[in-house]
Each structure stands twice: as structure tokens, then as C-alpha cells.
Swiss-Prot record:
Domain of life: Eukaryota
Protein name as it appears in the record: N-acyl-phosphatidylethanolamine-hydrolyzing phospholipase D, mitochondrial
Lineage: Eukaryota, Fungi, Dikarya, Ascomycota, Saccharomycotina
Catalytic activity entry: an N-acyl-1,2-diacyl-sn-glycero-3-phosphoethanolamine + H2O = an N-acylethanolamine + a 1,2-diacyl-sn-glycero-3-phosphate + H(+)
Subcellular locations according to the entry: Mitochondrion membrane
InterPro entries hit by this protein: Metallo-B-lactamas, NAPE-PLD, RibonucZ/Hydroxyglut_hydro
Keywords linked to the UniProt accession: Hydrolase, Lipid degradation, Lipid metabolism, Membrane, Metal-binding, Mitochondrion, Phospholipid degradation, Phospholipid metabolism, Transit peptide, Transmembrane, Transmembrane helix, Zinc
Transmembrane segments: 54-76
Function: Hydrolyzes N-acyl-phosphatidylethanolamines (NAPEs) to produce N-acylethanolamines (NAEs).
EC code: 3.1.4.54
Entry similarity comment: Belongs to the NAPE-PLD family.
Membrane disposition: Single-pass membrane protein
Length: 468
């Protein structure tokens, strides 16, 4: 009996130990798998270290040469500016006045290493570091631009009108229009007209319709001019990029066919792909662009293109009337990507008729203390209408070399002795830090303080205005 009991107890004990052993094996890490992971991690560590090393080398191989390039460009530009200032000062100190030759010496296009640079003392070169640093700062801004969420409130703040365009253009069907051919030729310096006394030609009214940003439709004496065309809801692509914050006053298909399209530079908010596609091919308007932009235009199907460099003048003849369009300097930059930065020039434009300044389109520019005085001395004072940008100036440390604020708009108005000024380049996209209505409010407040609020203000979208 004792033997049987002992045997049973021994079997029970062995069974319990066997069960415990099996349970422990269920939770015991697999030796082969853990060993494999350990060996795998040991193999990947050198690869990770190597990839980090190559990433650092690649980053340094880009940043170091670019920093050296930017440093060289800055030094070369400053050297050229000093040389030009010295030569201009010697030339003009005997005359005690601003001369056209001095303007050519001081403010002719400047190229460094195959790219255009600004020949202005007021300009500070923008590097890639600054550009992307400002983009990072923008990520932390809340409700940038102060855009109201309520659509009805936005419509009250930014009313949109249906354009009437100008005399006899309300009922015109753009699809049925055929543009009259223009006779054009670039003039040499000896044949460029200078300012003369007022005559019948300068008494024709100017009709202007602001379509957003720097896009304006201007009619003068039957000549139709479109500036910096922009008819897209997004800047970069049809569905990408900063979105338009206001309604478009007119679709591109509703715009009466212009005779001339002026493009101040190739930034996406001054030239969109939709305009290139719509006004290309045969019977397209005459595109007038800065030097270096023609190849981009032709690659997008626009063949009726003429390039102008600073101080060059194009003679245009329509209906036996002769007009002159001159490209004048501006302080800005160009580029639609990082690779083509400053490969083409940027400029402003001045339309003259019978030697009198009619329309000044600034495009984008910073303020230069004697530039606009020199433009006035060359082409005459009393410009009927100056279209000047007044937005995108915050933060000032970043924007000031390339954009003007409302105070500087008034300075340019005084320098040009312009009769009327419209503040544009605001209220269309959020591209800077100021409240979206601030440019309008500041400009009109300063103009009222100066006693000329009826001659200097911001237009309403789509509203066609007449300037005698």
C-alpha cells in the first residue's frame, strides 16, 4: 500500500513539474529569434551611421558653396554700386542736376555670374537661408492676415463690382474680337521722346479697372493694356499654393481682348499659367516682358513677345496714333523656382503719348531715394495715373528691400509728381504678416492727412474708374 501511494505521489509530482516546465517555455524568449535581432541591429548600426555621415556631407557640400557664392555676389554687387555712384557723381557734379547719362551709369542692369542683381544702395540680398527662415516663422502665425471667416463680412469689407472696362466695352464679346495688328519697334536712344508741353493727346481720360493684386485693365485713347495678368484662384498650381481671399471680379473669358500685356516680372502673383494659355498662339496680344523672360514665354506657347531692358523704349502704333512704352528700373527680384532666381530682369513700365507720361505701372519694387526722380526727369512730370503696390511689407526686416509700404507710396507719388495714384498689390492673397486691410487704411489715412485723398487711394475690385 505504501509502495502504491508513493508511486502515485511520484507520478503526480512529475506531472506538475512537466506542466510548470511547459508554462515557462511559453513565456521564455526564443533564443534563436533574439539572437537574430541582436545580430541584425549590430549590422544596421554601421549603415545608419554611414547614412547620417553622407547626409551631413551632402548638406555641407550644398551649404558651404552656396554661402561662398552669396558672399561673393554681395561683395561684387557692393563694389559695382560704389563704382557707379562715383562715376555718376563725377558726371553730375558739374551740372548740379540729375542727368539721363547719370541715370544710365547708376541704374543700368547689373549682372553677376550670369544672374541679375540690384544696383541700389538700399537693397539687401536675400539668401535662401532668409527665405526659408521667414517661411518657418509664418507657420507659427495664427489667422495670418486677419481674414474674417464669415463670407458676408468679407464681402462688406471687400466689395466686388462688375467691370465696365471703358468706353464702348460693356457689351463686347471677347470671343468674337479680333485684335488689330500693332506696328512696333524698339527705339534707340537718339529717337526716344522726352517730355514736352501738354497738348491734345494728353487730355484723353484714362480708364482703369483693378482685378486684384497688380492686375489692372487700362484703356487710354482706345489702347487697351493689361498689367501683370492673374486670373487663378491659387498661385503655384490650379489647386496648390496661397488661395485667393477675395472673389475675382471677372473670369478671364469675360475680359475684352487687350492690345498689350505688360509683365513686370515672372513671379506667380504677377503672371499665372492660365493667362499664358488663354492669350497665346495666333492673334494673341503683344506681350511686353523684361529682358530674359522671352524663352519662358515661348516655351508656354506665347510667340508675340518683345523683351525690354531698363531704359529701353518700344514705339507702338495703333489707329495712326503713336505711343511709347518704356521699361524703367525697379528694386525687386525674379524667379518661379530656386533654379531660375534672377535669371530674368524685373522692371516697371511707363506709357507716354506725345511725350507726356500717361500710365506708370510699378509692378513690385522697394523704395530708392533718387530712382523715381530720375524717371520723372527723363520722361516728364504729371503722370496721369500711377499704379503703385502698397501691400506685402511685413515683416519689414524681410520685405523692405523688395516692397514699399503706404508711406513710401506717397514718396513715389511726390518723386514722380503723379496726378493720381492707385494703391494695388493688396487684398488678394495673404503673402505677408500685416492685416489684409491695413495697406488700404494706412494709405488713405495718410493721403487724407496730406490733403489729396481724392487723388491717392485704394480702388475697389472690378470698379472701372475714370481719370481725366
Amino acid at each position: 500500500m505504501n509502495f502504491v501511494t508513493c508511486h502515485v505521489q511520484m507520478r503526480l509530482l512529475l506531472q506538475r513539474r512537466l506542466v510548470r516546465l511547459r508554462e515557462s517555455e511559453l513565456f521564455r524568449p526564443q533564443t534563436s529569434l533574439s539572437t537574430f535581432k541582436r545580430h541584425a541591429s549590430q549590422k544596421t548600426r554601421p549603415i545608419q551611421k554611414c547614412s547620417r555621415k553622407y547626409a551631413r556631407i551632402l548638406l555641407l557640400s550644398v551649404l558651404v558653396p552656396y554661402t561662398g557664392y552669396a558672399f561673393y555676389v554681395s561683395l561684387a554687387t557692393v563694389k559695382q554700386i560704389d563704382l557707379r555712384n562715383e562715376m555718376c557723381q563725377r558726371l553730375e557734379e558739374n551740372n548740379n542736376e540729375v542727368t539721363y547719362k547719370g541715370s544710365l551709369l547708376k541704374y543700368s542692369p547689373l549682372e553677376v555670374l550670369g544672374r541679375f542683381e540690384n544696383p541700389f544702395e538700399e537693397y539687401r540680398i536675400q539668401t535662401v537661408f532668409e527665405f526659408f527662415a521667414n517661411r518657418v516663422f509664418e507657420l507659427f502665425e495664427r489667422n495670418r492676415g486677419g481674414i474674417p471667416r464669415d463670407v458676408h463680412q468679407m464681402n462688406k469689407l471687400m466689395p466686388v463690382h462688375k467691370p465696365t472696362w471703358g468706353p464702348n466695352l460693356v457689351d463686347v464679346d471677347p470671343a468674337e474680337e479680333t485684335a488689330l495688328p500693332l506696328e512696333c519697334k524698339v527705339l534707340d536712344e537718339l529717337h526716344i521722346p522726352t517730355a514736352v508741353e501738354e497738348n491734345e493727346g494728353s487730355k484723353c481720360p484714362v480708364y482703369n479697372t483693378w482685378l486684384g493684386q497688380s492686375c489692372n485693365y487700362t484703356v487710354y485713347n482706345g489702347l487697351r493694356i493689361l498689367t501683370d495678368p492673374l486670373f487663378s484662384d491659387f498661385l503655384i498650381h490650379k489647386t496648390l499654393g496661397p488661395k485667393r481671399i477675395t472673389q475675382m471680379p471677372s473670369q478671364i473669358t469675360e475680359v475684352p481682348k487687350p492690345d498689350i500685356i505688360l509683365v513686370s516680372h515672372n513671379h506667380p502673383d504677377h503672371l499665372d499659367l492660365e493667362s499664358l494659355e488663354y492669350w497665346s498662339g495666333k492673334d494673341s496680344p503683344l506681350w511686353i516682358v523684361p529682358k530674359g523672360m522671352k524663352s519662358y514665354m515661348t516655351s508656354n506657347g506665347c510667340d508675340n513677345v518683345l523683351e525690354l531692358s531698363w531704359w529701353e523704349t518700344l514705339q507702338v502704333k495703333k489707329n495712326n496714333e503713336i505711343y511709347h512704352i518704356s521699361a524703367t528700373p525697379a528694386m525687386h527680384w525674379s524667379g518661379r523656382s530656386l533654379l531660375d532666381t534672377n535669371k530674368s530682369l524685373w522692371c516697371s513700365f511707363l506709357l507716354t503719348h506725345h511725350g507726356n507720361p500717361i500710365l506708370f505701372h510699378a509692378g513690385d519694387t522697394g523704395y530708392v531715394k533718387d530712382l523715381f526722380v530720375r524717371i520723372k526727369e527723363r520722361f516728364g512730370k504729371g503722370c496721369k495715373l500711377a499704379l503703385l503696390p502698397c501691400g506685402q511689407y511685413c515683416p519689414e526686416w524681410h520685405q523692405k528691400p523688395r516692397h514699399i509700404n503706404p508711406q513710401e507710396v506717397l514718396k513715389i507719388m511726390k518723386d514722380l509728381e503723379a496726378r493720381n495714384v492707385l494703391g494695388v498689390h493688396w487684398g488678394t492673397f495673404v503673402l505677408s504678416g500685416e492685416y489684409f486691410l491695413e495697406p488700404k487704411e494706412k494709405l488713405e489715412m495718410l493721403a487724407e492727412w496730406g490733403g489729396f485723398k481724392d487723388r491717392c487711394y485704394c480702388p475697389e475690385l472690378g470698379k472701372t474708374e475714370c481719370f481725366d
